[in-house]
Amino acid sequence: VIKLDKPIVAFEDAEDGREDKAPRKIIRLADEREVQIKVAFSMVSIEGAKKNLNLELEHWDFDTVRKEAENKWENYLSRIEIEGTDEQKINFYTALYHLLIQPNNVADVNGQYKNAKDSVLLSPFGIYYSTFSLWDTYRAAHPLYTILTPELLPDMVNSMLLHAECQGYLPIWTLWGKETHCMIGNHAVPVIVEACLKNFPGIDVEQAYHLIKKSLTVSHFKYDVEAYDRYGYFPFDIVEE
């Protein structure tokens, strides 16, 4: 959903000879010198996107939005202070910024989300995290989340458990709530186990154990238990990488 602070006087097809799958449009405004645009997404519905837009950003004060974003980032980036040269600080805080741009809450403001099977559900905790690049992040990023952003950990883990309840095994590499199956293995396991061993609140340890055991002992796409038990690894001619 897109909303502008200037009236639209014309909405035309872009005739540039390109054959894109999505239609390309040209918007004509009464005053084209300066325009502010709000954009909102929803994985559930257009109505959901409208609600997200209206509740998450009610005003048109650009400077206020910029300051609010600055304050939010300052809250997270200031949790670690380092000493060094300006270049070293730039490199470090850029890496810290990259750490914090995912995972993403893909639920609407009302807590609705689409699960791995495209069913619309209501998150029991109002949030549903996705963009779990777990084979990249289980080694260092997720352990750092337990130290740097502990308030976010239970919702991350519970999102993984919701995903596993739906598709039958823990997430491999999720994007917009769907499984991409990028890479083999079960890298969600150490992430969940660490959170449980560190006694993060709000996590059902028995449920976590059940889903971990099921993910490790029941074959699923790119995970052949019999092949692994026989060879101790996944042969490329038996298990697709």
Show which residues each predicted segment covers.
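A conserved hydrophobic secondary-structure block that centers on an alpha-helix together
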Residues: 19-20, 130-131, 141-142, 150-154, ...
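Stable alpha-helical elements in mature extracytoplasmic
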Residues: 69, 136, 152-156, 188, ...
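Secondary-structure capping and boundary motifs in well-ordered enzyme cores
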Residues: 87-88, 127-136, 181-188
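Active-site lining segments of carbohydrate-active enzymes
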Residues: 180, 184-241
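Acidic/polar, glycine-enriched structural segments that form the non-catalytic walls/loops
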Residues: 1-128, 162, 169-172, 202-221
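A general alpha-helix detector
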Residues: 52, 72, 76, 137-139, ...
